[in-house]
Amino acid sequence: MKHLEIELKILLKKDEYNRLKDQFTGVTPVLQTNYYIDTPDFELREKKVAMRIRTFEDWAELTLKVPQSVGNMEYNQKLQLKDAENYLSKEELPQGLVLDELAKHGIQSKNWQVLGCLTTLRYEIKTAIGLMALDQSRYFDITDYELELEVENHEQGKQDFRQFLEKNQISYQKAPSKLVRFVKSMKNS
């Protein structure tokens, strides 16, 4: 499956996260783990694309993100959890949509490497302004907090997101993606 993901995000302080969590009452959090994948020579990063296997309690998904003028085109391939665990341990990828799309970008590696993992506890709720996700993520010795808003229209979404943040007394500052934060921390550890 493929779809255009237009997402706005902000890193939060722990107290901001705790305040916002009150707005997610009744929402059961989902634990998800992202395993970031690249070639040994970082061919994906060089081409500005990102790939991960994300595991949930009883299923998994292989995702390729390709930047567009606005947002990322996301290619998702659903996996059985046991198959995902097998691919991760062997550092192999399944045939299908993601490998086909990589080939279109001139990437036909058979050499994959799992860079590491980032685990997120996510509260997600559909709001009038878009799909909102409140995340607490752990990677290496870091815990960070993030608010994401997935929208249909970037400009309207930006306006709505800023109003939401203002109403909640949080100043907007664009946040790097989880992968960028993970890789930066990987270099520092």
Descriptions of predicted regions:
Residues M1-S189:
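Phosphate-end processing signature that detects enzymes handling 5′-triphosphorylated RNA
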